[in-house]
Amino acid sequence: MNITPCSIKTLKGLYDISGVEVGQHFYWQIGGFQIHAQVLITSWFVITILLGSVIIAVRNPQTIPTDGQNFFEYVLEFIRDLSKTQIGEEYGPWVPFIGTMFLFIFVSNWSGALLPWKIIELPHGELAAPTNDINTTVALALLTSAAYFYAGLSKKGLSYFEKYIKPTPILLPINILEDFTKPLSLSFRLFGNILADELVVVVLVSLVPLVVPIPVMFLGLFTSGIQALIFATLAAAYIGESMEGHH
């Protein structure tokens, strides 16, 4: 049996692909707790970018807006329109929450697509986008669940729980199950899409470096933005649903 150098190279490439992993965690030990440090580091980085950009752009508001001020005013209008469409006339208090969710997820996703986190060497583990960790997406989903429970209870009081037996008490188990499936779908949709995008890029780079992965990276930027929009839209829709009491 003849094994050519080409076939050996092909087998080696396939072996390298088989070694692609989701990633290793970098931990901090604080007291008796083990903390995913890479999530905190990259999350702080994203938050610093957001706060720094806003402070620089709007610290001196101009009557004739600068380009940066125009951009952030456009982003604010977009978030307000999104909140009003999904929540209704009482959208005002929820604009900061929906905006925070959208901007944090958007910048986190783009940081994973644009920044070479992997080249930063750690004692163990590796850095990645915050939304590439299931802990982050679950936390965001649980915050959304807490928000729509608060919205419903603050408007309707204990009568909010009547929704579980409407239109018929037979649907009680299904209505309760729905409150568990909402955060699950939010968290796993975001985590799965971001993780899949990064893995596809890693595999393509290992096969054909530099040229072929570039269109996939641009596609990743597009889908990253779409995922942030989907999460924010669903969060606003759930809040509006809890306040209006319709399904």
Curated annotation (Swiss-Prot):
Subcellular location per the Swiss-Prot or TrEMBL entry: Plastid, Chloroplast thylakoid membrane
Transmembrane segments: 38-58, 95-115, 134-154, 199-219, 220-240
Domain of life according to the entry: Eukaryota
InterPro entries the UniProt entry points to: ATP_syn_F0_a_bact/chloroplast, ATP_synth_F0_asu, ATP_synth_F0_asu_AS, F0_ATP_A_sf
One Gene Ontology term, aspect cellular component: proton-transporting ATP synthase complex
PANTHER family: ATP SYNTHASE SUBUNIT A, CHLOROPLASTIC
Assembly, per entry: F-type ATPases have 2 components, CF(1) - the catalytic core - and CF(0) - the membrane proton channel. CF(1) has five subunits: alpha(3), beta(3), gamma(1), delta(1), epsilon(1). CF(0) has four main subunits: a, b, b' and c.
Family: Belongs to the ATPase A chain family.
Protein's name according to its UniProt entry: ATP synthase subunit a, chloroplastic
Organism classification: Eukaryota, Viridiplantae, Streptophyta, Embryophyta, Tracheophyta
